[in-house]
Amino acid sequence: MKKTIFILGLLGLTIFGGLYAKRKFYDPKHRLENARTEVKKLADKEEIKNGDLIFQTSLSGQSKAIQLATKSKYSHCGLIYKDGNDFYVFEAVQPVKRTPLDKWIARGQDGKYVIKRLKNADQVLTPTTLTKMKQVGDQFKGKNYDLTFEWSDDKIYCSELIWKIYQRATGIEIGKLEKLSDFDLTNEAVKQKMKERYGDKIPTNEIVISPVAIFDSELLTTIKSN
């Protein structure tokens, strides 16, 4: 009898735990509520500033391939701006746009993120420079997401967007530029995604900048991660 009660109790806890985890991590409404609480804490503690960079593991269809090819769990990134009392992420999705920070966080895997900042941000990111960064960004607003990761301004992808904004507004290059051939293209998931995008003509000499190249830059310091 005791054994039966124990098993039933354990089963109940397992079901409850599963339902709680599903609500916490998979229910869109609850994910957004959590993200709003997180953003409020960040704002109240003044932990984020204009020009900060934010990284996450995206839930997009290409995220896994990016992670495997670049050997990093971070597959998406954006640039944080404050407008009035609200924070936004300027990002390259479809199309390039600004997204409320809470919605951006809620969209990522488990609501996890890392915020980074230039080590000398106080000297570099003056009001004039931030205005220039926004002006550079406005040139990309509304452009299509670049599925083939070409180094042109016709279309744009996430890490390319923030790299070019910083470089053109401040002269600072955050992250080492690489070629497509520098990545690990051997995994089957990566091969399949490359086949979808390029067919048999993979542009291995194409210049690229990955989220992890920016993430690992020695010019940045970590401000917050959850």
Located regions from the model:
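Cysteine-nucleophile amide-bond enzymes
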Residues: K2-N226
